[in-house]
Amino acid sequence: MSTNPKPQRKTKRNTNRRPQDVKFPGGGQIVGGVYLLPRRGPRLGVRATRKTSERSQPRGRRQPIPKDRRSTGKSWGKPGYPWPLYGNEGLGWAGWLLSPRGSRPSWGPNDPRHRSRNVGKVIDTLTCGFADLMGYIPVVGAPLGGVARALAHGVRVLEDGVNYATGNLPGCSFSIFLLALLSCITVPVSAVQVKNTSNSYMVTNDCSNDSITWQLQGAVLHVPGCVPCEKVGNMSRCWIPVSPNVAVRQPGALTQGLRTHIDMVVVSATLCSALYVGDLCGGVMLAAQMFIVSPQHHWFVQECNCSIYPGAITGHRMAWDMMMNWSPTATMILAYAMRVPEVIIDIISGAHWGVMFGLAYFSMQGAWAKVVVILLLAAGVDANTRTVAGSAAATTRGFTSMFSSGSKQNLQLINTNGSWHINRTALNCNDSLNTGFIASLFYVNRFNSSGCPHRLSVCRSIEAFRIGWGTLQYEDNVTNPEDMRPYCWHYPPKPCGIVPARSVCGPVYCFTPSPVVVGTTDARGVPTYTWGENETDVFLLNSTRPPRGSWFGCTWMNSTGFTKTCGAPPCRIRADFNASTDLLCPTDCFRKHSDATYIKCGSGPWLTPKCMVDYPYRLWHYPCTVNYSIFKIRMYVGGVEHRLTAACNFTRGDPCNLEDRDRSQLSPLLHSTTEWAILPCTYSDLPALSTGLLHLHQNIVDVQYMYGLSPALTKYVVRWEWVVLLFLLLADARVCA
């Protein structure tokens, strides 16, 4: 048995009454009645060594090593913490005015503002603040606040999805930079430039003022698919394209003023990165894009028609040119890399202090990727080119066999009270496509066309109408007299509906734009096979334009020999429409309104003011088109391919300058390896593969070139967004939410 005294239970009497340690928020404490300063040593990660005066004191409860916590995000939206953007005072007063009780909605631990960063702080502040204000409204505040909070959580889910999709890398900037950069490295299909001549519109390759993005003294950044045309005094001259969207006044002009801009961009981005204000600089850079206007150094006009008639190119020359450009990207990168040693010497000798400062700073930081970007950026300034091969000799194409004659029909036109129709005795309404009537259409050589000049005298050319402006509008209430003259391209048809089969002679053709024959049905749409003999047999022609509907319009002949039409609503090309002087466009009216395409405004067989869809009963419905020429075409409507033939009214005596050309939205067939087949005196809005421009034949009116030679240094596009993205990358600007 041990002789040691039995330990006594501690009570208030036998316990030494020593003052307890009192700790202060600043880190100091009172030990033995003496205030001790906060412990020395590192703040985080390592325990400080106890001083000699502290070693005799009892060690308190072991505190865990404090961890470094992000200072942003956790305090957002919690009670007692201020709202960002100085919104606390405003929201507090607004809540007090709206609800005397001043109750604040409870978000709980899932407050969207807890996970906000950078741009997300602004977004979540607005959405959550709106939800708080909704909750302050008396009586209905609870349901409205709940709905608003649900919307705020939904926005936060979208932001989290964006962060996850972009990789959620530290800073979140590099991944978004790569995504945006990939979207910029493209060779886009350029838009066709349109010139307003005050009376009509015409196609051109000259850049409009809206197409000029940025101007330097000797270079211009513009949208792809045009060439700047500068007017100096009374002379207009085309600039030299060095890429699809960069042009220079003379060779070498691009490098004269670009070095200063490179210095400014690099030094600004380096300072933003060094001062840790990359987010602020990036926001200022992005916001400035809305207000900065390009300086006006030049007067650009649309009078040159640059490269519109380049001359013919042989297939051998196109193959050689494409073979020389098999690897333009590798060649460009190799040329840049080979110039880096020379560029370093040029930077020092040329006193490019901005580039030198950026190279020095990012080298000390170990950001070698940014060093490479700056070197390649500087290397691209001094690049030049040398012509290797000369231009190919132009080849000519004869006029022989250019047009094929149309079909002829032995019919006679009758004028009854000013209305023209086919003689009733020539009609056999029961003929079908399998009888001898179709054969007679093509083998009868005589046609009495003496009434055609009188009949077509009421038809007007497109030049007779006023030019359009503004947004296209549809005319749903087309009211034409009984003889609405469908043989004139500019007479719009009435809306399609239900047509009794007994009033129709022959088949009903509808245009998708390919011609299709519509069969008879009953009122419910069930097909009937009685040749329209029953009174209940009808043609259901109701439809809207493709691709939403079935057809653009329909044509048939009634039992008295009159041609009838119906179609989708035509387009109003002017807000101040006047029926006597203005055009209700039922086709492609490019020369009066650049937005009036056949896809938007087409109402029947007329593809252009001079061309219509060819179909077996064309000469029965439109006998005065007997001398039209036939062309094979291909169109895409809503992703569906249509191969059909078109009949066009064009002879060699008709004018066909640029201002006389209509637009045909075709996917052209090929005449040869370098030539597209288009409708006569039109143009297709598909640019050439190599230049992005329109290249037409000056003498042959149905040829458009699909390939053109260009003095461009590179086929890739230099976009203004590249400059913004490089600045954001160098400045460490983060754009994640």
Curated annotation (Swiss-Prot):
Region (Interaction with EIF2AK2/PKR) residue spans: 2-58
Topological domain spans for side Cytoplasmic: 2-168
One MF term in the entry's GO annotations: RNA binding
HVR1: annotated segments: 385-411
Keyword Disulfide bond: yes
Marked site (Cleavage) residue numbers: F177, L178, A191, V192, A383, N384
UniProt family annotation: Belongs to the hepacivirus polyprotein family.
Additional detail: Viral particle assembly takes place at the surface of ER-derived membranes in close proximity to lipid droplets. NS2 associates with E1/E2 glycoproteins, NS3 and NS5A, which interacts with the viral RNA and core protein to promote genome encapsidation. The nucleocapsid buds at the ER membrane where E1/E2 glycoproteins are anchored and afterward associate with nascent lipid droplet to acquire APOE and APOC. Secretion of viral particles is probably regulated by viroporin p7.
Protein's recorded name: Genome polyprotein
